[in-house]
Design a protein with these regions (language model features):
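Juxtamembrane transmembrane-helix termini
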Residues: 22-32, 72, 96-99, 103, ...
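N-terminal signal-anchor transmembrane alpha helix
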Residues: 3-27
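Small-residue-rich segments of transmembrane alpha-helices in multi-pass membrane proteins
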Residues: 108-120
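Core segments of alpha-helical transmembrane spans in multipass integral membrane proteins
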Residues: 15-18, 22, 34-71, 84
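Intrinsic-disorder-associated, low-complexity terminal segments enriched in Asp/Asn/His/Tyr and depleted
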Residues: 127-128, 134, 138-141
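A charge-rich, low-complexity, intrinsically flexible signal that marks solvent-exposed coils, linkers
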Residues: 5-8, 30, 69, 77-78
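Transmembrane helix-loop-helix
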Residues: 67-91, 95-107
Length: 143
């Protein structure tokens, strides 16, 4: 797997681990309130605190799965699937919460998914005989 894609996946996993930290470890802090644009007093409500902590565990799960897909499974398909899921969730959040979520939570994932597709296209071109194979080989050699 491409080192650039691995770096992007690590950054995405770190972002989701940080969200876990905010939502589960310090769910009613001033930092969490600032990041999510909420009042601390609202975050201290037991139902809200429980919901935040639960959501944080899901975010940690995404981070762990992404790291496993990259470094244990070495699966481009699993990575692409997780990135697509992250983008879908960010898109949903941009419609329901704030339009900027697609860039804040999904921006790195969008770039990483584009890298996945670019790499797949180059691999297909390289596997084909003829001019496309030579072009892809040339591009790969220049990296």
């Amino acid at each position: 797997m491409n080192i650039v894609l691995q770096i992007f996946c690590c950054l995405i996993a770190a972002e989701f681990a940080y969200i876990f930290y905010l939502e589960t470890v310090i769910p009613d802090s001033g930092t969490t309130a600032k990041v999510f644009g909420m009042d601390v007093k609202d975050l201290k409500m037991p139902a809200m605190k429980t919901a935040m902590e639960n959501q944080g565990v899901y975010n940690l799960g995404i981070a762990v799965l992404l790291i496993l897909a990259v470094f244990v499974l070495h699966s481009k398909d699993a990575v692409a699937g997780l990135l697509a899921y992250i983008i879908c969730v960010a898109l949903y959040g941009s419609f329901t919460v704030s339009k900027t979520i697609i860039l804040k939570q999904g921006g790195l994932a969008i770039i990483a998914l584009i890298l996945c597709f670019f790499r797949a296209v180059l691999q297909l071109m390289r596997n084909n005989a003829g001019i496309y194979g030579h072009i892809a080989g040339y591009i790969e050699d220049k990296r």
